[in-house]
């Protein structure tokens, strides 16, 4: 994957895009996936969702720094990763 370099509000961001709203950066959160332009890890938001919290509550809980669309993309990225890394059952 290609690293993207962009200047936003005077700050340089270097990351790999996993989707429009989900990125990985070696300098942010140990390279774990985050919501773009934040240090909010998708794992935390997905954990809250898995424990029954509504999307609206999660978005509100992050003070509007993420959107419902971004949360849906986090679900998609996680699902694609899971399916791409399933072990072979023929062993």
Pin down the residues of each PLM region.
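Acidic, low-complexity/disordered tracts enriched in E/D and polar residues
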Residues: 1-40, 79, 83-91
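Long, charge-rich, low-complexity alpha-helical segments
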Residues: 38-91
